[in-house]
Amino acid sequence: MSDSPSISAEERKRILRERRAAKMAKGNATSRLNTILTQGNSVKDVSSVKSVLDQEPTGATATTTGNHDLDPDHHDIEGFINTPGINASNDSVALSNSEDIDEMFKKIFGGQVPGNGTDGAGSEDPLAQMMKMFSQPGAGTGTNTPFSEDPFSAQPEEFKYQQQLVQYNTYRHQVWKFRFLAVRYFALLANFIYHFYIIGDSISFASSSHQFIRELIPVEPARSFFTLFSTIEVVIIASYYFLGTKEGFFSTATSNNFVVKLLDMGSMVLPQLQQFKTIAVRLLGYYELLAVLLGDLSLVVVLFGLHSVLGN
């Protein structure tokens, strides 16, 4: 018996592995499996078993391609971006947003989209149209004006009607203001003539540089005059305020005020300025009432001056 060279354990395992792989490659894996299973079973039969090596691969087994790492460094999202369903939904969302913007511009500019090349309101610059809106009488006052409810949804006919309504309210305000002016001056002149010409004597109101002459002037006519004057002023100013609040005269009177227009333009950038506009309109209304009182007091000073000069 010839001596064979010594074989290491690793080499022996490799040779056995190669032999086993060669036998498996020849096929008949099922028969070999059944032979192994039936060894020593002389009494009980064992049903034939089919080896997995002889089974044909089916389409149910999905083959994975690409990155087999469970936690890859880079995620491939190209499939999600190029998915037809997602792209179609993104296109529909963008189209709906574009339609919403066009619809908004149509509402703002009376049915014409700015820059569409057609004649009319839409062909002008949007900034120029906005300045034109605020240059109209009664812009931004909030009562009896074309901007009181929703100016951007008004049609041209309705906008023209609102302009005519503002002009009519301005005319009515001027008429009532003239009526109150006539009543005030009539009441003031009647009060002055009654106290200093009818019931007063020749020195009822005389100007002099001498103190003893001024002390001879009776106090009763002047006191009664100012009492009646204060009563008439309170009644007239209260009536004017009530009528102005009911008919919206104060908002109409302040519609063309520079402060109100400046606050209207500023509120487009800072909506917080809207509350200051309400305060400004109220203060301008109070200023008009104060102007009524100051005008009547000025007339009283003029009448006293004329009487002191011409009454001697």
UniProtKB/Swiss-Prot annotation:
Subcellular locations according to the entry: Endoplasmic reticulum membrane; Golgi apparatus membrane
Pfam families reported for this sequence: GET2
Any Gene Ontology biological process: protein insertion into ER membrane
Q: Where are the transmembrane segments?
A: 176-196, 225-244, 289-309
- Keywords for the protein's UniProt record, in alphabetical order: Endoplasmic reticulum, ER-Golgi transport, Golgi apparatus, Membrane, Transmembrane, Transmembrane helix, Transport
According to its record, how does it sit in the membrane? Multi-pass membrane protein
Q: What does this protein do?
A: Required for the post-translational delivery of tail-anchored (TA) proteins to the endoplasmic reticulum. Together with GET1, acts as a membrane receptor for soluble GET3, which recognizes and selectively binds the transmembrane domain of TA proteins in the cytosol. The GET complex cooperates with the HDEL receptor ERD2 to mediate the ATP-dependent retrieval of resident ER proteins that contain a C-terminal H-D-E-L retention signal from the Golgi to the ER.
Relate the assembly described in the record.
Component of the Golgi to ER traffic (GET) complex, which is composed of GET1, GET2 and GET3. Within the complex, GET1 and GET2 form a heterotetramer which is stabilized by phosphatidylinositol binding and which binds to the GET3 homodimer.
What this protein is called in its record is Golgi to ER traffic protein 2
- Which organism is this entry from? Scheffersomyces stipitis (strain ATCC 58785 / CBS 6054 / NBRC 10063 / NRRL Y-11545)
